Amino acid sequence: FLLSLYHTFPKLQGKRLWLAGESYAGKFIPYMADWIYKHEAENQRAGIHLHGINMIDGFFMDDIIGKELPSMQFAQQHYRSMNISEADMSALEAKAQKIGIADYVEKYLHYPPKGPLPVPRGLNKSESVYSAFKKLAKKANPCFSPFYVIATAPCPLNSMGQNVTSEKAFPHNYFNDMPSIKPIIHADNKTYLSCSRAKPFKIMKKLHTQFPIHTVLPGVIEKSNRTIIQHGKLDYIMLVNGTSLAIQNMTWAGAQGFQSKPNKTLLVDGETAGLYHSERKLSLVQVDRASHMIAAYKPKPAYKLLQFLLGQIEEEDLIKA
């Protein structure tokens, strides 16, 4: 597809290419980048010049690291703002103690890491703290959104036809409801959804495709000029410290994880917008009060990070207003 695209639109040839995406794209983008790097000669002849990748709240790791292991810490940090009762939290803490994740993040999220992350023996799907906290949140707030945990009523569809409380996509969106759009861009006259109703990870599982953190992501980071991993702190689809744990469990460029803790302040319009850290061509950015969809809820930090990805600003500019 990419070779055909560059052949059809020759003005793209020779321009810098960056791959960026959110959520599911965290599994796909590293494999796409790896394919491009592995076919460098062919792509160079076609004018394709990949410079790096950007993953936003991405699934580049499995659910155990991304969701389960940091779930109790997330619950402790946010249950009051989500109106979850102390009694419910006590029951959740007992469950976390039983399966061995009550203080997992505090024990194992180190800079530099002390070795590969252990998986508690008691961890199992039937005792999921992640799922239990999600149910408590829904009980406390019928409009609870795992995309943005402090969302409140009303809970309508957004312009893309996404009901963020149910994690389902619906056909009532601007693309389908405005018949003039599809002909303008030569799109087929069919119904489009903002997110597939199919389960792409199940499809990839059948193909025996592993999450890229275990396979191609380290090499992609090493070959790229810049790799950025962003995460919104109020996302419960994939947890911010799940991303941190995953990075600390990954080896690239001769070392495991970051050697220093992320502590640099991301500034936007003179205000703190999050934390960031860069080592060995990988940058992690944790965006304050941002959802799973950072650009939708925090467009100014998202735009500044896009400028950083494209090289329009340097890393030291992230701390400048």
Task: Please annotate each region the language model reported.
Residues 1-321:
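Terminal and linker regions of secretory-pathway proteins
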